[in-house]
């Protein structure tokens, strides 16, 4: 099992380089991804041990902030967030390896994107370790372009159909349900793919699906960035982007499993919260004007079948 974990780690660290390089090619000022390598001290008082590399870009003309973060951690006991639905895992040691990214563009017409790909192994030090993969990618637009959502979902469907034709409808629905703010009765964006507890096939089959899915993120996102990054925008557009970013913050702090897992397990706070946008605003009881561009996004982000 250790060999398989290391193989996935090698894939993720190379993917991190591929993604940061591709995004930098669209940046028009001197902003670059900066590498922040870290290691948790291996001491008895540390609940979580391990290492990682958080790559951050800030202050770009295209990307106001972005993080592409790799981590490999292990602990003696899974935190409550990881065992809430799987009580049989309570008390087991674990290894978790993953890559998580969030890109916050400056231009309000370029959507925010998020992706995450990970493996968990519970009881890795036992004769019968339990493994599963999780991950996916989702898109959060501030202004609606239907062709962008169609391209995003078509890319997701193509990669799913290559492995299992039941995956896209199942993981698309799961994504719509997961990235939902209950207290707002709103979806975070137009979705994409979300899956967890993936071990329905052999390890190699699941590994191949997850790595193909991860490699398709750039195919899904870069064409949208290229198409929208030079659209002129006003302060009104920027203000609405900042307001909608507030929803992103609310979801990450209240509902996101990765954030909750990281904080409960004693993870590296600076890396866990690096996905937060650089700026966000809240306005009391604000409502968009009827028929405005801003109102349209509330219909646009409702779950629908994007691929006819």
UniProtKB/Swiss-Prot annotation:
Catalytic positions?
114 (proton donor)
**Residues that bind a divalent metal cation, according to the entry?**
104, 114, 153, 183
The chain's coiled-coil residues are none
SUPFAM superfamilies registered for this protein in UniProt: Coproporphyrinogen III oxidase (SSF102886)
* Reaction catalyzed: coproporphyrinogen III + O2 + 2 H(+) = protoporphyrinogen IX + 2 CO2 + 2 H2O
Hey, where's the site called Important for dimerization on this chain?
183
Q: What does this protein do?
A: Involved in the heme biosynthesis. Catalyzes the aerobic oxidative decarboxylation of propionate groups of rings A and B of coproporphyrinogen-III to yield the vinyl groups in protoporphyrinogen-IX.
Protein name from the UniProt record: Oxygen-dependent coproporphyrinogen-III oxidase
The encoding gene is: hemF
